[in-house]
Design a protein with these regions (language model features):
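Patatin-like phospholipase
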Residues: 1-250
């Protein structure tokens, strides 16, 4: 059910990388996103008072940090789904958190963040003369481009949806004030909008991703552990972050 597993990653994090391996031991809140294999729910691992679930979400409090990371990074079909035992002894399987829902910025906002910085590496290739057309690079490059285009569409739709809600909310707020309509009706209508679409007007979002001209990122081996490859990816990410943060005066 996968070419590899993330069990070695879990062991490395548990034995060598993490000084604390339980969510409740941390001084800050940490949430790790996965996808429930045998359901359609998104899984949110964290320090919750109890595990609970809704129609679309499963809040998991019985996983260690290393187990949650191993589950979240199990990207099919390269990595097999990762099993975590519940307190009742039932093994629940999870895989990559991006499968069910891209970015999941609502998790930070739902837990009190007023600035959410979301970083992702997906950037479809844009034609450049020095590289040429992707058809010259064979099936792997074409498949990668197709996958990136699908994911980018989901991300752009998510960002556009957030922007549309913000614009509608601000337009209604401004109209009521401009027309000097009753304050209690304005507040009530805005409260209904916030509740129905889970909108938080005091939360700002910053999205960091490679720029279209960063074709090196597209061709980089994201699964490589080679130090030079990793250093190159980190440098591209750092430059992308600086470029985006400067646009937001951060």
């Amino acid at each position: 059910n996968g070419l590899f597993t993330t069990r070695a990653l879990e062991k490395y994090l548990r034995n060598y990388a993490l000084s604390h391996n339980e969510f409740q031991q941390l001084g800050a809140e940490l949430f790790i996103i996965g996808t429930q294999l045998n359901h359609t729910r998104k899984a949110i691992f964290g320090n919750f008072p109890e595990s609970r679930k809704t129609q679309y979400l499963k809040f998991v409090n019985y996983a260690s940090i290393s187990e949650a990371v191993a589950a979240s990074t199990s990207l099919p079909p390269v990595f097999a789904p990762y099993g975590i035992k519940s307190p009742k002894g039932k093994e629940m399987f999870f895989f990559d958190g991006e499968i069910r829902d891209t970015l999941s910025t609502h998790v930070a906002a739902d837990h009190g963040a007023d600035l959410v910085i979301s970083s992702y590496s997906i950037q479809p290739y844009h034609y450049t003369p020095e590289i040429g057309s992707l058809h010259q690079f064979g099936i792997p490059a074409i498949l990668n481009q197709a996958l990136y285009q699908v994911i980018e569409q989901k991300i752009n739709r998510h960002i556009s949806h957030q922007g549309d809600i913000r614009a509608i909310y601000q337009s209604i707020d401004g109209y009521f004030k401009q027309q000097k309509l009753p304050e209690e009706h304005r507040e009530r209508l805005l409260a209904i909008i916030r509740e129905r679409v889970n909108y938080k007007p005091n939360v700002d979002y910053v999205y960091i991703h490679p720029r279209p001209q960063n074709h090196e990122m597209f061709f980089a081996d994201h699964f490589s552990l080679n130090s030079q490859v990793l250093e190159h990816i980190v440098r591209i990410g750092f430059k992308s972050a600086i470029h985006t943060l400067r646009q937001h005066d951060l």
